[in-house]
Amino acid sequence: MEKLQIQKFGITKDGSKPYLYKMKNDAGMEVQVSDFGATLVNVTVLDQDKNPVEVVLGYEDAAGYENGTAAIGAIVGRNANRIGGACVTINGIDYKLAENDGKNNLHSGPDVYQKRMWRVVENGDDHVTFLLHSPDGDQGYPGALDMKVTYTLDEENGLTIHYEAVPDQDTVINMTNHSYFNLNGHKSGSVLHHRMQLLSDAFTPADAQSIPTGEVCSVDGTPMDFRSTKELGAEIDAAYEPLILGNGYDHNWVLKNEGRFDKVAEVTGDESGIVMEVWTDRPGVQVYTANFLENEAGRNGAVYQKRDAVCLETQNYPDAVHQKNFPEAICKKGETYDTKTAYRFHI
């Protein structure tokens, strides 16, 4: 493992001066993260010809992340994904949230974790730990907590993201990372020829506002079936209502890991030969094919467009606070929220 490098990463609107932290292992994989948003800024891995490939979309500096609207590289919290009606009831008390997606709440509203300065509380050559204090009432949620996010790079080309928090009241916690992956390289265009396998037999269909109906439906015989590896674009334009409503894939798949940290997905770049495995202990994964990216100016002159990337956002199911048959959405007072997701790369 090479020595951790730290450099300036621009300046924010309020005058804060974020830093960029670079980790690099002996296999040539490099990970860049920032204390602005605890953001995953860049991941570089070697392709089948030993050439370095930047496999996540991103911006030149902190200003890009501050001004961006697509949650590129973002640590999303306190609750990722959607809450119907922008309201949650905890212990009989209604808590109103921001309506920022029609009448619903998406990714906890406009005051997002990813556009705040986090504090580095620990770092080494192979890891960086960020901390954000989220006070009682933050984003409308009850309870204060200190959210810790640790990025760890290992010598086997694995990047692990570890989330930890202990709330002082019962509250919603559902964290994710919203990185956009293109395994052929961040400037290489469409990912529709990437191949994907999901270890999932079911998904949670949603309505026209992307709020789950409460059903859990089998993928059997549908374009949602990725149990056998197939191209992302093989059926993305099928005349299938969930795909029409989502403008492509933007759905939660039900995972079979039963709370264990296990492999849940695999994606392969058709040109680079780079394979990315996704491991998690979370019950769901949102696969999003960047259906609404348009003329997004990224780093090194890149301009990102629709379906130029795929997100695999490990999570609790969307709107779990309103669906009794979905996994528990509330983290109890004094309990530890502790979850890991890893992205492992190989050829």
PLM feature spans:
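An exposed, glycine/acidic-rich loop-and-rim segment of catalytic or binding clefts
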Residues: 2-347
